[in-house]
Amino acid sequence: MATEFDSIATLIIRDLASGPTPPRVASGSGPNRLHTRVAEVVAAMGPPPWSRRIIADERQLVTLIASPPCGGNRPHWHREFDEWWVVLAGELEWELTGDVVVRARKDEIVWVPRGTVHHIRNVGQELSLRLAVAMPPAMHYFSACEQCGYTDDGPREWCA
């Protein structure tokens, strides 16, 4: 005998059955692998500087970035998203809008809110590795740095 709750139960079961699409998992060496060994990526990429996309989909971008001692990136900011990093090796320094400097080492996390000019440099004596987490399309808007006065658009060695 049917009850007033049968249609509700059917609706719930139907909703669960048509849930999210399973993840798109790459079987090769590209992004979106279920398991990535950082040491294998480092060995395959060779000497820094380099970056390798680890995860890329419509909601997130995760990039492994290696910098040599004194290496760094150009000052920039993001309009659409906050960015954060997990330091996996070395010692890095973030220079931020508002005369803020953050120094981070292995196993530390740095978060920078959208609209904040920032650049990162390796201040240690060894290779630095960090995972950068962003939101696609991860547009970068390049800008001068208040703290260091850096305005050139070219690469720079940060240990002068």
Residue ranges and their predicted role:
Residues 1-64, 74-75, 145-160:
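A short, N-terminal "cap"/entry segment at the start of jelly-roll beta-barrel domains
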Residues 58-60, 68-72, 91-92, 136-139:
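Short, charged/polar surface micro-motifs in flexible loops or helix N-caps
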